[in-house]
Amino acid sequence: MRVKKGDLVEVIAGKDRGKRGKVLRVIPREDRVIVEGINIVHRHMRPTPDMPQGGIVKNEAPIHISNVMLVCPNCDEKTRIGATYLEDGQKVRKCKKCDEVVDK
């Protein structure tokens, strides 16, 4: 997967199209990511010893990786990502629009 935890992404399809958020978790087995503040769902929780009132809790649900696009930290645009190798042989991600390295 070309998106990693901590990356800034923009949603390109679905009810949250155009919104940006930070990737909280990547689920490679299902090709999904959990993005902060995106795809909010309401869970109805029954009363438990930890939460005696119960109630409705808002959580982020996973969104398919094809519905998000990485935002380049250098040019601040949503972009496709390519891979390249540095002189020392390390593989890094590269922005297709500005040709800058995305990885720290």
UniProtKB/Swiss-Prot annotation:
The keyword Membrane does not apply. Keywords: Ribonucleoprotein, Ribosomal protein, RNA-binding, rRNA-binding. One of its GO terms (biological process) is translation. One of its GO terms (molecular function) is rRNA binding. CDD domains: KOW_RPL26. Coiled coil: none annotated. InterPro entries: KOW, Rib_uL2_dom2, Ribosomal_uL24, Ribosomal_uL24_CS, Ribosomal_uL24_KOW, Translation_prot_SH3-like_sf. PROSITE patterns: RIBOSOMAL_L24. GO terms for cellular component: ribonucleoprotein complex; ribosome. It holds the Pfam family KOW. Part of the 50S ribosomal subunit. One of two assembly initiator proteins, it binds directly to the 5'-end of the 23S rRNA, where it nucleates assembly of the 50S subunit. One of the proteins that surrounds the polypeptide exit tunnel on the outside of the subunit. Belongs to the universal ribosomal protein uL24 family. This is Large ribosomal subunit protein uL24. It comes from Halothermothrix orenii (strain H 168 / OCM 544 / DSM 9562).
